[in-house]
Amino acid sequence: MTPTQAHGRLDELGILDGSHGPGCYALRVSVPSGVESVQRTWLDAIDAPLPDAYAEQLAAAETCLYVGRSGNIYDRIMDHADGQVRRASFIRAFGVTDIHGVWPDDANTGVAERNRARSLSSATTCVWSDGELF
């Protein structure tokens, strides 16, 4: 996803205005199906293996999300989309395919970020946040 696509998607979702302040956000990422493919993709980007339990959970998920937080959600999403300034390991390994949502009412805290990740995770959805898989 490019910065132009990310901007357009925020606008399509009707959350562009709300993204210009602090809060949490979720990005949809592309994760291969199959534990070996997940591990190979991770190792191609990150010079350390992914825990097997994480690889198994990611491979089995229908949807994989990355949840983050920022003092300015829009700027952080643009940084992730650009890939030159900020590139979280999970996003470096598995590319961003869509914006799942933004929550400007969430506090810009680690607790709010983890709570958002927990609320989005389910039997079919894996959520990566700050090095943890929910």
Regions from the language model: what does each represent?
Residues 104-122:
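A cross-kingdom feature marking charged/low-complexity
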Residues 85, 89-108:
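Basic nucleic-acid-binding interfaces
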Residues 1-79, 110-116:
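GIY-YIG nuclease catalytic motif and its immediate N-terminal context
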Residues 80-84, 119:
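Conserved short hydrophobic interaction patches
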